Amino acid sequence: MPTTPLRKTAMTTRQPIYKSLYFQVIVAIVIGILIGHFYPETGKALKPLGDGFIKLIKMVIAPIIFCTVVSGIAGMQNMKSVGKTGGYALLYFEIVSTIALLIGLIVVNVVQPGAGMNIDVSTLDASKIAAYVTAGKDQSIVGFILNVIPNTIVGAFANGDILQVLMFSVIFGFALHRLGSYGKPVLDFIDRFAHVMFNIINMIMKLAPIGAFGAMAFTIGAYGVSSLVQLGQLMICFYITCVLFVVLVLGSICRAHGFSIFKLVRYIREELLIVLGTSSSESALPRMLIKMERLGAQKSVVGLVIPTGYSFNLDGTSIYLTMAAVFIAQATNTHMDITHQITLLLVLLLSSKGAAGVTGSGFIVLAATLSAVGHLPVAGLALILGIDRFMSEARALTNLVGNAVATVVVAKWVGELDTDKLQSELASGGSAILETRPEDDLGVAEGPTPANAVNTTKTV
C-alpha cells in the first residue's frame, strides 16, 4: 500500500480555530483579566493554576536539554563545529544584548519617565524588597562562573539550573562521541527517552490555557488595573521600546540574513501567547527546541543556542535593566552624569548575563546591579515592585523573539541552516504541534534506527 510521510500529513492537517492552542490561550487570558478585575479575591486564589503549569514545564526542561544537547553533539562528525557554534553564539549574544542595553539607556534619558516624581527615598518601604536585595548580593562574576559548575550531577537536574545542566550535557556529549560505536546503545536510549519527553510536553501544553488563565487572574487581582496608572509612563515607554527593538534592531538582523521578523513572529505565535500568559520565557523553551529545528536549524545548533540564550541573550531584560535603573535615579532626584551611566552600563554588561528566563529573575539582577553600582538607592526598587510583574511580560516576549532570531542567525553563520526549509516554513506560518513527529525527536543523531524507521510513515 502507498505510504505518506508523517511530515506531509502533519503539515496539511487543519483544525477548527477553537481547537488551536493560541486561540484557547487568548480566550483564557481575557477571562483571567475579567475575573481578576471584577473578583480580585477569586483572582488571587487562582495563583496556583499558573504556578502549577510553570512547575510542570520546568519539570521536564532539564532532561529535554540533556537529550537535545547530548544527541546533537554525540552525533556530529566534526567536533570543531561545536566550538565554532558556541563561539559565534556568544559573539552574537554580546553584540545584541549590548545594543539592547544602549537602547534602553538612550530612551530613558530622552523620555525621562521618572522626572518630576520627587520621591523621598527615606519614605519608601524597603521591607518588601529585602529578599530581592539579599538575593542580588549573591550575584558576582566569580560566583556566577562557579555556579555554572554543579556540585553534583543529580543536583544540577534536581535544581533545574539550565547552565549547570547544559555544561554537564556538553561534557557528556563529547565523552559519548569519543566512545564511537561502543556508545551507540547509550545514544539510542537517549533518542527514545527524548521522544518520551517531547510527548510529555505535548500533554502538558494542553493545560497551557488553564495556566495562563490562573496567572493572569492573579496578576490583575493582586495588583489591579489601577496600579498601572501611577507608573504607566514607565510601562508605556518600556513596551514601546521593546516593540521598536524587535521591529527595528531584530528586524534589521533578520532582513540582513534573508528572512522576515514578522513571519518569524507569526511562526512562533503560540509560544508567544504561552509566554504572555505566564510571564516566563522558560515556559516555551521545550516547544522552541522543536520549532527551531523544524525551521531548518540543525539540532546541534538549536541544542546549544536556545538553552545558552536563556542566560546570555535576554534582550528584553537588558532593556528593562537600564531603563529601570535610570528611572529610579530620576524619580529620587539622584544625579547621574555620563560617568555614572557608563559605569552602570559596564556593570550591566556582566550582571545581565546572570538572568535566567524565569519570572522575577530580572528584578533580582536589578537589585544586584544597584548594589554593585553603589550610587543608586537600592530602596528605590520599591517604586517599581508593583508593576514589575506587568513589565515582565514584555521582557519575556522580547527575550523569546531574540532567542529565535539568534538561533536562525547563528545556524546560518556556521552553515547549519536549511534556507529552503526556513523559507517554506515561514511562508506557511508553521503548523501547530498536534503531535510529536519522529523528526522532532531531537535525539536522532545519525538517522532513524530500524525501529524508528517503521514509524516514519503512515499508511493511508
Swiss-Prot record:
Gene3D superfamilies linked to this entry: Sodium:dicarboxylate symporter
Instruction: Decide whether keyword Disulfide bond is in the record.
Output: no
Spans through the membrane: 21-38, 53-75, 88-110, 153-175, 196-218, 231-253, 301-323, 363-385
What is the native source organism of this protein? Pseudomonas syringae pv. tomato (strain ATCC BAA-871 / DC3000)
**Where does the record say this protein resides?**
Cell inner membrane
Q: Which GO terms describe its molecular function?
A: fumarate transmembrane transporter activity; malate:proton symporter activity; succinate transmembrane transporter activity
The record's annotation in HAMAP family points to:
C4_dicarb_transport
* Organism taxonomic ancestry: Bacteria, Pseudomonadati, Pseudomonadota, Gammaproteobacteria, Pseudomonadales
Q: What is this protein called?
A: C4-dicarboxylate transport protein
Membrane association type = Multi-pass membrane protein
Alphabetic keyword roster = Cell inner membrane, Cell membrane, Membrane, Symport, Transmembrane, Transmembrane helix, Transport
**Pfam families referenced in this protein's UniProt entry, alphabetically:** SDF
Give the GO cellular component terms, alphabetically: plasma membrane
Instruction: Enumerate the PROSITE patterns for this protein.
Output: NA_DICARBOXYL_SYMP_1, NA_DICARBOXYL_SYMP_2
Family note:
Belongs to the dicarboxylate/amino acid:cation symporter (DAACS) (TC 2.A.23) family.
Some GO term, biological process aspect, for this entry: which one? L-aspartate transmembrane transport
Disordered: annotated span = 438-460
